[in-house]
């Protein structure tokens, strides 16, 4: 659906990336045209490079269940080193374990788009996912978490951005 989605680019330069074909069909038939399917839970560097040629602000919106959230985290951590000031990645997690198909059928376009406005940039998504899993009173867990975050930040290829993301995290 990339060919149709790129014809619907808006001033926000966003595209919604969902897991499956039915998600695309439901969103598209609801009037959301800037949507593409990843056909699964993996997203490669090659795929994101192609997407970035047309959209600088992709929004990953996988299923809101546990497996969808874990898949989104894997994507976030894999693509995190590639971000720069022109090409970003955002994440939107649907509530109550919903997938985009079910969510839009139950809530409609307006509420879906309203929910998308709460998207998180990749570094915030990673931070929030991990910070909610650790015992904040356990110095060993905090230390391990800080080391993992630093390691991820050092992987950012854009040196200037790396500096500011590190400052933001720590």
Located regions from the model:
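Short, surface-exposed helix-loop/turn micro-motifs enriched in polar/charged residues
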Residues: 16-19, 35, 50, 67, ...
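Short, flexible active-site loop motifs that bind/organize anionic cofactors or intermediates
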Residues: 17, 38, 62, 90, ...
């Amino acid at each position: 659906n990339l060919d149709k989605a790129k014809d619907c680019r808006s001033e926000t330069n966003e595209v919604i990336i969902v897991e499956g074909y039915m998600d695309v069909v439901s969103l598209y038939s609801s009037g959301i045209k800037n949507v593409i399917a990843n056909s699964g839970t993996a997203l490669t560097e090659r795929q994101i490079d192609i997407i970035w040629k047309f959209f600088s602000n992709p929004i990953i919106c996988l299923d809101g269940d546990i497996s969808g959230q874990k898949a989104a985290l894997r994507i976030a951590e894999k693509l995190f080193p590639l971000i720069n000031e022109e090409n970003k990645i955002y994440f939107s997690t649907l509530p109550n374990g919903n997938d985009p198909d079910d969510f839009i059928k139950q809530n409609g376009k307006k509420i879906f788009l309203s929910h998308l406005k709460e998207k998180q940039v990749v570094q915030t998504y990673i931070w929030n996912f991990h910070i909610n899993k650790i015992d904040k009173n356990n110095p060993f867990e905090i230390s391990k978490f800080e080391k993992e975050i630093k390691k991820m930040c050092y992987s950012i290829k854009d040196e200037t951005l790396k500096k500011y993301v590190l400052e933001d995290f720590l």
